[in-house]
Regions:
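Short acidic-glycine-tyrosine-enriched beta hairpin
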Residues: 42-43, 69, 78-105
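Conserved short histidine dyad/triad with adjacent acidic residue
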Residues: 32-39, 45-63, 96-100
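Residue-level recognition of well-ordered beta-strand positions that form the cores
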Residues: 50-52, 76, 117
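Ligand-binding loop in jelly-roll beta-barrel domains
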Residues: 84-87, 97-127
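A short secondary-structure junction signal
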Residues: 49-50, 82, 126-129
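A short, N-terminal "cap"/entry segment at the start of jelly-roll beta-barrel domains
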Residues: 1-45, 130, 134-138, 142-169
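Glycine- and acidic-residue-biased ligand/ion/polar-headgroup-sensing regions
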Residues: 54-55, 64-82
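Conserved catalytic motifs of the protein kinase core domain
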Residues: 46, 68, 111
């Protein structure tokens, strides 16, 4: 049997190292939060990030339309709704579509770092259950571009699949 033809010819691997890319400070949204965009695919609704959160961070309650995979590298964090299930270094968390929760880090804890793969949309609510916003790969990309511009970083380096759908001829 012959080998399959490569669909995408590559001269190099598509690889990023967070130690070689500047963090994007999104403290204007969540104080002290820094993110590294790794892969943003607005067409398919997938966003892959490395995140740094300071102690005391609390994200608004949010509903996931798609699955989330989160691997904790440093620190301890949890969801307000599941105090018995704190995540620690080495923890892998799978969040199925349709889940809703409130991320928090203890005030007396250490900074948290982790790697996440998010599919779909996060629908964000305030403490009273009122709709605030939707976060998705496209909106996150705009947040990163705006924050990088404000910080004078220039164009952040991340992997983005080829552009929007178009006719071939």
């Amino acid at each position: 049997m012959p080998l399959p033809l490569a669909v995408h010819a590559q001269d190099r691997l598509l690889s990023l190292n967070i130690h070689e890319e500047p963090a994007i400070d999104v403290g204007h949204l969540i104080p002290g939060m820094k993110l590294w965009p790794l892969f943003l695919d607005p067409d398919n609704g997938t966003w892959v990030l490395y995140a740094h959160y300071p102690p005391g961070t609390r994200l608004p309650q949010h509903f996931h339309t798609g699955a989330v995979h989160f691997f904790t590298m440093k620190g301890t964090w949890g969801y307000k709704e599941y105090p018995q299930d704190m995540q620690t270094p080495g923890s892998y968390l799978y969040e199925p579509p349709g889940t809703m929760h409130t991320f928090h880090i203890p005030e007396d804890g250490e900074p948290v770092e982790g790697f996440m793969v998010v599919s779909g949309v996060n629908v964000v609510f305030d403490d009273e259950g009122n709709y605030l916003s939707t976060d998705h790969a496209g909106s996150m990309e705009q947040i990163f571009l705006d924050a990088a511009r404000r910080q004078g970083i220039g164009m952040p380096r991340y992997i983005r699949p080829s552009g929007p759908a178009a006719f071939t001829a």
